[in-house]
């Protein structure tokens, strides 16, 4: 006689074991129809799984994020169902849930085309609209293997042989004649899986190993209702328009090429963006009293072994040999900063010591994961390390948090998700050390009135950390900033200071990054602004255009005045119609377009318009310069008169 306790505290008693679906039906037919799965005593279960003991139960519907992820997983099975109907010879590998959707890896000799994907999507919809029940059957390991052997599903057999114990009881999910294997849960009926779209097909190695066979990975997205699906697809369309790779080419910002995969060739305008970003962060460093240093690009393997990075990162490090010594190009800056700290005796009076670097780092990322500026092999970190005492940790972390928020606000990012990762099972130090460290981070967040989520056990073995994830205009999440306590590296590399009692003590090291990678952050900004950078950041801030040759000298004089005042300005004296010039520089996203005709020249004025076509009228050169200087110095996100 199980007693079921619901989230509101109410209880329901049943004579026999019941399923989540039974409980939902007991509450009401509407909830039964909406029920996708259940969370029983904190564990997700299929709606059909029986509950035989007193339990806490939350009924999962498509209104819950968990429900959406379950229906996405079931859409992957639906995809498998459709594939096997259209190409019975296909072998199904794995079909997991990913952000906003799902995929399935398929072994199929026939190369899937855009037309195939369209036909596959239609077959999926035809199947889903029959509203068939998904039948779950828990079997022995041997029964599962026999079932897939009969079907020739070699990848399912491999999963059973290599990943599942023979004592296990796998769950098989039957979609009419199609059978798949999964830990679940899945939807009870395919009426939940009718708001989806197949997005693309790509190659993927089995098990992610290039020594294995290349499979075809079909990606899809799925949502709880048509409105959510349409919203997502609209966002994807907008994201495609804002793709930094496309805009980077249009605006001549940078390029990449096969001879240097994952390395950026910055062009003049792109490098201007980079330098402005660096200049901005450098000013922040001054405000928060950092030293700026520069460490070597390459160091002996022995140092990386002492730091512990060789054991964990050697596969991702570029190495070279010279004079019988092995060197590694740095994937991070921290060991180099400890070497600088170690030069000369340090006293407690020298702490906190804040050390920052725009460090050029390299990591040997897999070629298949490289993606424009977002995922590169060579990148610049706005990295800093703070050496301090235990008592100073909370204040230093609080300052880091303020620096993060001040910086993100300048770029218009206000939706920041903060997560605090706490002690993992395997860790250095005693519980008292971790209690103090975690409490210092918590109090720093609370003091700054920051809402945060705690991720138990997700910290590094050497200390807890705070992660800052910003959300852009399309509500995409970008994890950029981090504040990480480190109680291990200073000790490993012999960093000490003389304490007030004249004993040698090891400092706490705080790793902190604001932007993370400058290259990646610029990619985010290109997409956030769709190439329409704020004036202070724009590679070219003003372009001055003449209507006829008669104004050419005056236009050049105006540009000279602007340049002397530190405004990035250029002129366009081409013998083209003024409308053509305006359109061209509008496409280049230049913030201010200044037109000069006879009247403007005679009155020592310029006619001002913005790249968005707003006519600001005529102004004297001095008035416009004064206004744009205010625009630039304030780092305004808006143009004049917006």
Curated annotation (Swiss-Prot):
Q: Which residues bind Zn(2+)?
A: 334, 385, 511
Q: Which UniProt keywords apply?
A: Aminoacyl-tRNA synthetase, ATP-binding, Cytoplasm, Ligase, Metal-binding, Nucleotide-binding, Protein biosynthesis, RNA-binding, tRNA-binding, Zinc
Query: One Pfam family name from the record?
Result: tRNA-synt_2b
Record-annotated TGS domain positions: 1-61
* InterPro entries, per database record: aa-tRNA-synt_IIb, aa-tRNA-synth_II, aa-tRNA-synth_II/BPL/LPL, Anticodon-bd, Anticodon-bd_dom_sf, Beta-grasp_dom_sf, TGS, TGS-like
UniProt entry tagged with the keyword ATP-binding: yes
Q: Where is this region: Catalytic?
A: 243-534
Which Gene3D superfamilies does the record match to this protein? 3.10.20.30, 3.30.54.20, Anticodon-binding domain, Bira Bifunctional Protein, Domain 2, Threonyl-trna Synthetase, Chain A, domain 2
Q: Which family does it belong to?
A: Belongs to the class-II aminoacyl-tRNA synthetase family.
PANTHER family on file: THREONINE--TRNA LIGASE, CHLOROPLASTIC_MITOCHONDRIAL 2, THREONINE-TRNA LIGASE
The record describes its quaternary structure and partners as: Homodimer.
Q: What protein name does the entry list?
A: Threonine--tRNA ligase
Q: Give the originating organism.
A: Shewanella denitrificans (strain OS217 / ATCC BAA-1090 / DSM 15013)
